[in-house]
Amino acid sequence: MEPTITAYEYSDIKQHVNALVSAYLAVNDRHMRSIIRAETIAYVTPFLPEGAPLTQAFLAGLQPDRLSRKEAAKLLPLLEPAVIPFPQFSTKQLGKLFRKVKKLKQPAWASLNLHELTYLGWNDGGSQKKYLVIPDHERFIGIRGDLAPQTIKGVCAICQTIGNVSLFVSTTKTSGLGTYTRNGNYICRDSAQCNRQLTDPQALQDFLAVVRPQR
């Protein structure tokens, strides 16, 4: 089966399923629970591959009148074969995206779920740098920037969620005369968590427009 669900759509589905679980815990009226369940199913169904066995199994799993968080956590991974995974770049491929970095720290690939990644981000605590690989149409853009050591509670410019954010600043060339400017914003310190919260890629593209190198 050809994967058709994007990572941010997968995150959106998960958020709606988790909201359904929360509603089950908060709402005692059986009829109201059935209405909320029907609304959730109606929302997530268009994202799913039509007629696929995993779609049928997933929707069937949403039918019980009470769905626990533990049950939801087991149900959601059923969709992963239908989710487009983020590519696992080789050391050489990453080196081409960050040509000016001599000793590029590699991402901790083993700890990442590629089905959850709309973009790739990892920290180099030794140099206080953060590296981002962001899709841009049919290619990928590598962004290297300074990551402030301080973490605050705030809204992430990428996932638009309140959490632990740090100031990320990149240096970009603004003209052919050698003029440079520093641009950035507050983003999640933990990029894996950021991806799990990202349901709309537009904010990511807006962020890229601010920090990307200018041609």
Which sequence ranges carry the predicted segments?
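Long, positively charged binding patches that form subdomain-scale interaction surfaces
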Residues: 93-163
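Generic hydrophobic, helix-prone segments enriched in Leu/Val/Ile
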Residues: 13, 17, 132, 204-207
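Generic preference for well-ordered secondary structure
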Residues: 1-4, 24, 28, 59, ...
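Short N-terminal helix-initiation segments at or just after the protein's N-terminus
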Residues: 66-80, 125-137, 208-213
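Cys/His-clustered metal-coordination modules, chiefly Zn-binding fingers
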Residues: 138-215
